[in-house]
Amino acid sequence: RLFRQTCILQLRYDPVTLTPRDNPDYEICVRHRHFIENYLAVLGCEMEHDPQEHIFRLKGEGAETEKFSQTTTMIILLVRMIYRDKILGEGLGATVTNLGEIREYGANTGLLSRKLTAAEWREALYLMGRHQMIELPAAVRDVKDETPIYLYSTILLYVSAADMNELIEEYREEADDEAVQENLPADADQ
């Protein structure tokens, strides 16, 4: 499962009730840590344990890496911003969002300047679920605007505060450049 999910959390949230439950895969990693580490070393991977976040994750040359599309990256940035704001404002019990709130953050920050397709939302939600950033109470295809989406702290591992601010600025500059291009008259180049 570590190869399919990229990390294993100590607590997983029940997709229906969104209540925390112990993850048996985490306990297996704790019990057999040295064997798993030796096995993964042969494959060119390293299993890293983060005791503060209570996760095991793969890293190294043998670990699968995935390039996210720009749209997925922007959605991850928005979810990271929501997570930060909820933790700072309401504490750990408030780490639930929904598509409506993500869209609102996107409009307010200028990161989502167009309506995203259902396929773009599905891709982003699927990848965030695969990488243990979120938990959905239903299949990705069944998620509606008000469906609760539980946010895991692992989103902090994928997007640091510095990375988040840098990417937001970069995407805003790109959006501004595109807006200027659209407003230029057709004969401006002549």
Regions found by a protein language model. Name each.
Residues 60-95:
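Short alpha-helical segments that sit at the start of domains
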Residues 14-23, 89-108:
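Short acidic, hydrophobic short linear motifs in intrinsically disordered regions
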Residues 41-49, 125, 129-141:
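A short, conserved structural fragment
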Residues 87-94, 112-119, 137:
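Short acidic, glycine/proline-enriched loop segments that cap or flank alpha-helices
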Residues 1-59:
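Eukaryotic partner-binding/assembly regions in large regulatory complexes
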Residues 55-60, 135-162:
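Accessory beta->alpha helical hairpin/"wing" motif in late/C-terminal subdomains of nucleic-acid enzymes
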Residues 28-36, 113-130:
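Short amphipathic alpha-helical interaction segments
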